[in-house]
Amino acid sequence: MGRSISLPLVATLTISLTACTSQTIRPEEYSGFLHDYSQLTEKKLPSGKKVLAWVSPTLHTHPYTRVYIEPSLFYPEMLPTERAPQSTLSAVTHYYDTALKHELGKVMTVVETPGPDTLIIRSSIISVAARTQSLRFYEWLPVTLLAAGVSTATGIRDQDSEITTEVAVLDAVDQAVVAQIVRKETGRPLDNDKQVMTLDDFKPVLDGWAFDMRQAYSSGGK
């Protein structure tokens, strides 16, 4: 008679995998880059994506016509690893800045120096990571569940690249914070736990963040 996998074990695996695949930012994951996280609430962007954000009522009462993009950075400082080398980290922040300038430049004038009627975009990358993908439906069958466990243990299961950002938007004159955003998203899938992550794994996410910021500003932050 074949051995069966106990229901408690399956339940435990289910809970564990669900926790690993969640894209919700928990308070303990906040980096400290933003001054105040207490007013963040879940908001649905025009693109349909959900993020944690706060927008001051004064943001769209002031005629901001210009935007200054501060160079983005890793916060806290992220040391390069074999899977996330310095070349990837540098490329990610540079591309993030370029994408923001490209999208926001469609609705505002991008300037090299902050001044009157200017918004400052102060962005950070707080994590770049890889996580093992959750089990697919067919892998919950008893035999394939065991096989999936072996694949995970040997490091051959597919993984997801993952990146998180925190952004503060400030008035350039008085440095008052007028908006804050925190979001985590999944990039391109990785073949295994040895694959080196590159900029290409995160480009769609970075493009999406910049696009959403432009759309949110154009829609009045609603």
Predicted regions, residues:
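Solvent-exposed loop/turn segments at secondary-structure junctions
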Residues: 74-77, 127-131, 185-188
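Soluble periplasmic/extracytoplasmic beta-strand elements of cell-envelope proteins
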Residues: 53, 66-73, 118-126, 166-168, ...
